[in-house]
């Protein structure tokens, strides 16, 4: 979606359809008339800045895209977009660094909206020792490194399960954001050599682990994602912290041995 070539009504309609809402559904959620919403979408009525932000809130549109809606309607963007090293984000940057450091000796990393690496703690690099150098050159894309044939893929024991998990996660990101760059990444990753279809998880499984073969043995990790709770800056809204935890005591011991020899 390009706010410079599409009218604001068309953009709103695309977001409504992306959220699988009828005009009646959105009008009821936003407490406006269906007629007025229809007029906004077809260009017969020009929405106020407040109305645009209200509709964007109901549609859960990302901050970056809310700025594009405002621009398409002739209004100034509302949400700042600073680089992570901007002095205004010093507090947030310190929080990220503190969280990454505090998670050691377990791996943790910060990524942007396209899954490009922004920062990582000292436990990440030893896990990437078998990755081709060109994949580690900035911008390092975490999903590409995970699934590329010259990345971690040959070392992931349950590659079929992990690949299916990552692609589904990326598909959900695309669904939420409508980001064409993420779609391009999805198409690229989907085109990598695919392992046999994943077998079902054990009946007592509650999540998909990452089972990684390393020089000291096979480690099993579970992961969590942390985001800032109330961001009003585009960069912070799109930043995620991925933290890995050993799934069992044996993996924790293997990780300790790997880091001791790094």
Please report, for each region that a protein language model flagged, where it lies by residue.
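Short amphipathic recognition helices of helix-turn-helix/homeodomain-type DNA-binding modules
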Residues: 50-53, 57-89
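Conserved hydrophobic/aromatic packing and binding residues within compact polymer-binding modules
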Residues: 12, 26-27, 37-40
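Alpha-helical residues within the helix-turn-helix
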Residues: 17, 28, 57
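Hydrophobic protein-protein interaction segments
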Residues: 88, 97-106, 111, 118-262
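Recognition helix of helix-turn-helix/homeodomain-like DNA-binding domains
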Residues: 31-46, 56
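A short, Lys/Arg-rich alpha-helix, primarily the initiator
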Residues: 1-19
């Amino acid at each position: 979606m390009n706010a410079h070539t599409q009218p604001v009504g068309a953009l709103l309609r695309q977001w409504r359809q992306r959220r699988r809402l009828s005009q009646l559904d959105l009008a009821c959620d936003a407490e406006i008339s269906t007629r007025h919403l229809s007029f906004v979408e077809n260009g017969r009525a020009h929405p106020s800045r407040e109305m645009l932000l209200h509709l964007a809130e109901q549609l859960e549109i990302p901050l970056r895209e809310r700025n594009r809606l405002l621009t398409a309607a002739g209004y100034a963007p509302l949400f700042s977009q600073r680089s992570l090293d901007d002095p205004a984000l010093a507090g947030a940057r310190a929080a990220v660094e503190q969280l990454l450091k505090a998670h050691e000796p377990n791996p943790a990393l910060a990524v942007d909206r396209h899954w490009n690496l922004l920062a990582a703690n000292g436990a990440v690099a030893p896990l990437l020792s078998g990755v081709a150098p060109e994949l580690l050159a900035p911008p390092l894309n975490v999903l590409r490194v995970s699934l590329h044939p010259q990345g971690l893929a040959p070392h992931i024991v349950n590659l079929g399960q992990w690949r299916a998990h990552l692609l589904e996660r990326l598909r959900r990101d695309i669904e939420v954001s409508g980001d064409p760059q993420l779609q391009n990444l999805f198409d690229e990753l989907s085109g990598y050599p695919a392992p046999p279809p994943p077998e079902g998880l054990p009946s007592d499984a509650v999540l998909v682990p990452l089972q990684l073969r390393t020089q000291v043995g096979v480690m099993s990790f579970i992961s969590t994602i942390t985001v800032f709770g109330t961001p009003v800056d585009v960069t912070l809204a799109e930043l995620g912290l991925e933290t890995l935890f050993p799934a069992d005591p044996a993996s924790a011991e293997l990780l300790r041995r790997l880091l001791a020899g790094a």
